[in-house]
Amino acid sequence: MGCPARFSTKGETEPDKGPKMREQAVIGLIGGMSWESSAEYYRIINREVRNRLGGVHSARSLMWSVDFGEIERLQHQGDWDELTNRMKDAAIRLQRGGADFVLLCTNTMHLMADAVADAIDIPLLHIADPTAEKIKAAGFQKVGLLGTAFTMEQDFYKGRLERVFGLDVLVPDADDRRVVHEVIYKELVAGEIRTESRMAYREVIARLVASGAQAIILGCTEIMLLVSAEDSAVPLFDTTTIHAIAAVDRALAPMPAAEMRASQ
């Protein structure tokens, strides 16, 4: 019996196995503002990695957690220069620790996002960007914004949504802004969830919807602890979940073609 024919594969193109996956990028998290929402970031990120990779996979991440008592005091004193220095320091520490990119796990402290981004050599994933992209992908134009008074009243967040993404952003009136802000700082950051506060938020949301809001941005990472879809007649966009999932998207992104060639 003759030997079976042998076919050389030399020079042949191997089957396309799709984009080569890199080792997970290291997610750097600036947390503690408050730790209640930072815990949600950690939970969502690791759950998402496990869901995508299977088994007992989890995220490669670092967290620098600040003392929120000090942060809250400086916020209400209006000492944004010192707050900026602290956020820059946290980002630099994460970069030195091996983070590949950084998240500020809070909406309010994105007031100094540009300064933080300028202080490091790795990317800062801005919380407003994936949120706005989700809203636009869903076909909404006019949105209501809930958050701390700093987030609702200053331009750093609302202005970014309007200028960069072309959204029309509504904020509650002065009385409703005070209610939203006080519930965040007096209850949610301490892990207190009260039915009467949920009802108050429902009323604020209803007034925004009556003013034309097609969707509501939960623009404080603690608000998702209090309200859910059943509290609103229009879709809610939870910035905590959106930001955390965007971090996983980046951490698990396929290796760019140039990087793939260099690794071969």
For every predicted segment, state its role.
Residues 17-264:
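Non-catalytic structural scaffold of enzyme domains
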